[in-house]
Regions:
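Alpha-helical phosphate/pyrophosphate-handling elements in metalloenzyme active cores
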Residues: 21-156, 281-333
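Primarily interfacial, aromatic-capped hydrophobic alpha-helices that serve as membrane anchors
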Residues: 194-233, 305, 365-408
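N-terminal, motif-rich segments that launch catalysis or mediate targeting to/interaction with membranes
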Residues: 34-88, 192-264, 270
């Protein structure tokens, strides 16, 4: 099958979205990513194992609360926030595979068993290739290190997401079976407490800088969340025709700057105590015309900063990751937030007076058609940039992930889709 045929198949809506994303990647690059698909399956399996292990003590604690057999309890939590960690692990898997001797796969091993048991003897029967053997050892160690940090990152992301959900009294994503008398709010309390303890245990195995990167990202994220009432007030006033509120939405929410005077900012991000030696520097991260992307500052504070901090956790643990890959992750998650969540939730956000890039555009634009086009154009800029950076860093899995986000979205639900 050639690239043109792959492109045609990628447009067939009856096919699974994940397959269409792979086909579109092949059509665009000419590279049919069999190895990448295999790595994705390994990433999925590893992260699923991490989550299962993290939730096992949650189920134990819920069972104790309910006074039932732990084997009868099933706990689940619905979140998409682990996707950037999965893409990062896939990127590190890919790097280790490329750096390994021919014929050796550093990822293909049992997670808990010593991977060196499966390192082949490279070279002739009488004279092994010691250099190749050492390269294999190094890449196996790199995979182990990447997986260990990813475990910390995934559990920390789950812990933080649960904490945010509880603060907002949103319990729909917490699901438990087999524990009569334990309602969702109580389930959430138990789950978050257990995960918080697990996160602290995992942090003990790393330098303080890893915890510092995580804490810095959380503080900045919470500082942005603290501005939510202000943005809600702007939206309410703008809907009443307040010209000053509309101007503030345009200047602060849509076109806010990471540098320069801003009455509601410390000059870099939203109100947050200065950090002596910050590792999160958005004013230095984005290059070229990227600082002018619509809604970049506010959406970076809303969702992007957590994943900037995630990459810094890997770095603080001794794993090198390129700035270009970090941009790919941040742009993907911002694009996904708008393209998947904000578009789908437009009607609810409008009713709840929740300012998002989507509700903002329908206030700022002169017509619904213009607002629709602005939403699509803004999201496309983020996802296109993410895809370019994925290619630049030889991370096809991230490129396919970005394509997957685009194909999952349905902007036709918005007003102004068709005149």
């Amino acid at each position: 099958m050639g690239p043109r045929a792959a492109q045609s198949l990628a447009e067939v809506s009856a096919l699974p979205t994940s397959l269409r994303a792979v086909l579109d990647y092949y059509a665009t690059t000419g590279e049919f990513a069999f190895d990448v698909v295999r790595l994705q399956r390994r990433v999925d399996a590893y992260v699923e194992e991490v989550i299962d292990e993290a939730f096992a003590p949650v189920e134990q604690a819920i069972a104790e609360e309910a006074g039932v057999d732990p084997d009868a309890v099933s706990f689940a939590y619905d979140t998409k926030l682990t996707m950037p960690a999965e893409l990062t692990l896939g990127h590190l898997y890919q790097r280790a595979s490329v750096g390994s001797p021919a014929g050796f796969d550093p990822v293909d091993r049992s997670r808990r068993r010593s991977p060196l048991e499966r390192v082949p003897i490279v070279g002739s029967a009488t004279k092994p290739d010691e250099a190749a053997y050492e390269r294999a050892r190094e890449q196996v160690a790199a995979v182990e290190r990447a997986e260990a940090v990813t475990e910390l990152v995934v559990v920390a992301l789950l812990d933080g997401d649960m904490r945010d959900a509880m603060n907002d009294a949103e319990y729909d994503d917490f699901r438990v079976e087999g524990a009569p008398g334990v309602d969702r709010p109580r389930t959430a309390e138990i789950a978050q407490r257990v995960l918080r303890e697990r996160v602290e245990e995992l942090f003990e195995g790393y330098p303080d800088a890893v915890r510092g990167a995580y804490r810095e990202a959380v503080d900045r994220s919470e500082a942005h969340q603290d501005r939510d009432p202000y943005f809600r007030e702007l939206m309410a006033d703008a809907r009443e025709g307040d010209a000053d509120a509309l101007a503030a939405i345009r200047d602060e929410y849509k076109h806010g700057s990471f540098v320069g005077p801003d009455p509601d900012s410390d000059g870099d991000l939203d109100d947050v105590a200065p950090v002596a030696d910050p590792v999160i520097r958005p004013a230095e991260l984005f290059v070229g015309d990227e600082p002018a992307f619509p809604y970049l500052k506010t959406q970076y504070g809303r969702v992007g900063v957590i994943y900037d901090g995630m990459i810094e956790m890997y770095r603080a643990a001794g794993i090198e990751i390129e700035d270009a890959f970090k941009r790919s992750i941040v742009f993907t998650i911002i694009g996904a937030q708008i393209w998947l969540d904000d578009i789908d939730d437009y009607a609810d956000d409008l009713a709840e007076v929740q300012l998002t890039p989507v509700t903002a555009e329908y206030l700022l634009a002169d017509t619904e058609r213009e607002a629709y086009r602005n939403v699509v154009d803004a999201t496309t800029r983020y996802l296109d940039a993410a895809e370019r950076y994925a290619a630049e860093t030889n991370s096809p899995l991230a490129g396919i992930g970005t394509n997957y986000v685009f194909r999952r979205g349905d902007p036709s639900v918005l007003p102004g889709h068709a005149d």
